[in-house]
A protein has these predicted regions:
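N-terminal interaction modules that seed assembly of large macromolecular complexes
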Residues: 8-68
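The alpha-helix within a helix-turn-helix
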Residues: 26, 157, 168, 200
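DNA major-groove recognition helix of helix-turn-helix/homeodomain DNA-binding modules
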Residues: 66-74, 193-209
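Short coil turns linking two alpha-helices in DNA-binding domains
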Residues: 163, 174-177, 192, 206
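Recognition helix of helix-turn-helix/homeodomain-like DNA-binding domains
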Residues: 173-189
Length: 213
């Protein structure tokens, strides 16, 4: 079971805010879509949303998030007048859906956008924007697995027949850390020797077996 960075009660607000941020930056301020994605993933804003910081989940509007992203990464102040829309834009849905998947999977926004280009997401919009969001998550999961092959830790753990939760309990290494090592959200090569030793003892392998080449 994936450990989420924040409670589900905050998810809808976070999704709406990121959707509004994408819509405002791309449609109102005319920032090229791939540029805004690059700004967002490079900014501290994306990391703070991943970590579940309340100020960025419920305390800021989408426009404020877009302004913070662009100011931090380019030094420019966005001051475009917000526009009224009759419905939710394609760009809104993209931000909204990606925010859900980040929460659901605990993967970084950076990793998600390494796999999904804006064009990919545009194409998914036409077939998925009226579907249940879990269908989007399932499709993206498949794409992520195809792109990020199994880590040595996951391969060895699976062969040993041990779940992530069992490995965490027996090794004393947090479940969240094990998940992040397996998803490559944390570099296992930079893990403490003690953590690597504990995991290796449980799985009956060497520390070197766990490291990524």
């Amino acid at each position: 079971m994936t450990i989420h960075a924040y409670q589900e009660m905050y998810l809808s607000k976070a999704q709406a805010s990121l959707g509004d941020a994408f819509d405002y930056a791309i449609n109102t301020c005319k920032i090229p879509s791939e540029d805004f994605i690059r700004f967002f993933t490079a900014s501290s804003v994306s990391k703070r949303m991943e970590n579940g910081e309340p100020a960025f989940l419920a305390g800021k509007s989408g426009i404020e998030i877009a302004v913070d992203v662009v100011l931090e990464t380019t030094g420019k102040q966005l001051d475009c007048e917000p526009q009224e829309h009759m419905g939710r834009s394609r760009e809104y849905w993209i931000g909204w859906a990606v925010c859900y998947y980040q929460w659901y999977s605990a993967r970084s926004f950076s990793d998600i956008f390494k796999v999904l280009s804006f064009e990919d997401l545009q194409n998914m919009y036409y077939t998925l924007h009226e579907a249940d969001i879990t269908k989007f998550a399932d499709i993206v999961d498949d794409k992520m697995r195809d792109h990020f092959k199994e880590t040595n830790l996951k391969r060895i753990r699976t062969i040993y027949g041990c779940t992530q939760a069992e490995l965490s309990e027996r090794s004393g290494v947090s479940l969240r850390s094990i998940q992040m090592y397996e998803q490559r959200n944390k570099d296992i090569n930079k893990a403490s020797v003690e953590a690597l030793y504990r995991i290796s003892k449980v799985l009956g392998c060497t520390i070197e077996d766990l490291l990524e080449k």
